[in-house]
């Protein structure tokens, strides 16, 4: 674990002391090396061996998310270069230092061995993200978005803190492995349903579940490119990871509490997918698409079958890469047209033909076409929910159809149609942008060859 954490910490002095012209090169190259090194945590056995100490450990559930965090840091650095072109050197340094600080908090959160440690790091990720949104966002509404983001997350996670203190008092420990192995005495009291709700609420707000989702479109739309990427790809996964971890100590799950949330998640998928159909703002459409996909993860996690757990873990990785790629593509359009409205940036296929190929691939990946891991994760989740209730097949089938419609609607709106007058004078694409897209798409396709790397502990 330290072989990833220490080099990431050393990025901070590297960024601080690099010369102006070398800062981007040093940080990009060094973070790519760290992401290559993190691949060693994949494909390990359940006997923890060298990946375990008293504070941090990695297992088949946390290591894919750990690798995803490391993989996205160089991509965020590459994607932010144009956005920060007119900023002073100190502001650029501050921006990169915030990204690396967020990365360190995420790495420690995904490998924390105790729930209280996880909770503290879960809250720590809030600070750099809030500063990135509030300082480097595009419009003045960014302050409003920052407030929504802060208060939704804080109010959702306060009951979790109380629940963790109560669990510590009852069981004497919050160690993840210890709680997994001990019989659960928490079920003897009538207050177990309240405890379950308190534990889940923080993660359901972070996912977010439909109904608690109002902060997400605002935060996504106002955040700069790196903020949108890390929010969609990794911060939402903190919620899914927390559910998969904490559900172990809440077993056996009470039908009285689980059923309403499974129903709300499946219904929320239909609702948010339908909202996508009438969006005019490109980033807002991708944000609502994220809520729809995270609804699948919530439903699969709460059903608590091995296939459900595997599908949820695979969906988190697949969605992380896909939504991050879509936000990068939306950003390339925004940098050229200075607008997120799809009507104003149509007809780009004629001007940027290679970029339209990336748009096509990203849209097809988003709707779950083979040979991507999105298909594998969706099939696993559909099978596990169908085994729980036959009726869910109608809802999930409808959701799949609507997802295909809005993905293709997004593609046609941006790429096809009559070109606007300002489309003729836009800049050509850069090699840097093509590299970012390729590095997003490569793992999505390659993981199909060996999906057990990302199927988590249930495999």
From Swiss-Prot:
Reactions mediated catalytically: a ubiquinone + NADH + 5 H(+)(in) = a ubiquinol + NAD(+) + 4 H(+)(out)
Keyword Translocase listed: yes
Name of the protein this chain belongs to: NADH-ubiquinone oxidoreductase chain 4
Principal subcellular localization: mitochondrion
Record EC number: 7.1.1.2
GO biological process: ATP synthesis coupled electron transport; electron transport coupled proton transport
Parts of the chain that traverse the membrane: 22-42, 65-85, 96-116, 117-137, 146-166, 194-214, 230-250, 256-276, 284-303, 308-330, 350-370, 392-412, 435-455
Protein encoded by which gene: MT-ND4
Membrane topology category: Multi-pass membrane protein
Gene Ontology MF terms in the entry: NADH dehydrogenase (ubiquinone) activity; ubiquinone binding
Protein task: Core subunit of the mitochondrial membrane respiratory chain NADH dehydrogenase (Complex I) that is believed to belong to the minimal assembly required for catalysis. Complex I functions in the transfer of electrons from NADH to the respiratory chain. The immediate electron acceptor for the enzyme is believed to be ubiquinone.
Top-level taxon of origin: Eukaryota
């Amino acid at each position: 674990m330290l072989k990833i954490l220490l080099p990431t910490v050393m990025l901070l002095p590297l960024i601080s002391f690099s010369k102006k012209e070398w800062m981007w090169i040093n940080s990009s190259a060094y973070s790519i090396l760290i992401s290559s090194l993190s691949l060693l945590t994949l494909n390990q056995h359940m006997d923890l061996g060298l990946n375990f100490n008293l504070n941090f450990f990695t297992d088949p559930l946390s290591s894919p998310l750990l690798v995803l965090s490391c993989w996205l840091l160089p991509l965020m650095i590459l994607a932010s270069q144009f956005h920060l072109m007119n900023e002073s050197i100190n502001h650029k340094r501050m921006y990169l230092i915030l990204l690396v600080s967020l990365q360190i908090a995420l790495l420690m959160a995904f490998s924390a061995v105790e729930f209280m440690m996880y909770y503290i790091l879960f809250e720590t990720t809030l600070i750099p993200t809030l500063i990135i949104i509030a300082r480097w966002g595009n419009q003045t509404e960014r302050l409003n978005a920052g407030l929504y983001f802060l208060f939704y997350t804080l109010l959702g996670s306060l009951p979790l803190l109380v629940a963790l203190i109560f669990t510590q008092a009852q069981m004497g420990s919050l160690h993840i492995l210890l709680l997994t192995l001990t019989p659960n005495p928490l079920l003897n009291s009538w207050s177990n349903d309240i405890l379950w709700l308190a534990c889940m609420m923080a993660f359901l707000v972070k996912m977010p579940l439909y109904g608690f989702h109002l902060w997400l479109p605002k935060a996504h739309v106002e955040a700069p490119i790196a903020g949108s990427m890390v929010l969609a790809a990794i911060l939402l996964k903190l919620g899914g990871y927390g559910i998969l971890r904490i559900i172990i100590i809440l077993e056996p799950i009470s039908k009285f509490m689980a059923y309403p949330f499974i129903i709300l998640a499946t219904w929320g998928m239909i609702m948010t997918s339908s909202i996508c159909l009438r969006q005019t703002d490109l980033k807002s459409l991708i944000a609502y698409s994220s809520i729809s996909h995270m609804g699948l993860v919530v439903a699969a996690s709460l059903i608590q079958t091995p296939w459900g757990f595997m599908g949820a873990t695979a969906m988190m990785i697949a969605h992380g890469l896909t939504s991050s790629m879509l936000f990068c593509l939306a950003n390339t359009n925004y940098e050229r047209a200075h607008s997120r409205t799809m009507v104003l940036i149509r007809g780009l296929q004629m001007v940027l033909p290679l970029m339209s190929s990336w748009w096509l691939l990203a849209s097809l990946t988003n709707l779950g076409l083979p040979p991507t891991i999105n298909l594998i994760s969706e099939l696993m989740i559909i099978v596990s929910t169908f085994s729980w209730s036959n009726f869910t097949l109608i809802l999930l089938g409808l959701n799949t159809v609507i997802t295909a419609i809005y993905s293709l609607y997004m593609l046609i709106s941006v790429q096809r149609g009559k070109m606007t007058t300002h489309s003729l004078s836009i800049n050509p694409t850069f090699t840097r942008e093509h590299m970012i897209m390729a590095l997003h798409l490569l793992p999505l396709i390659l993981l199909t060859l060996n999906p057990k790397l990302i199927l988590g502990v249930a495999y």
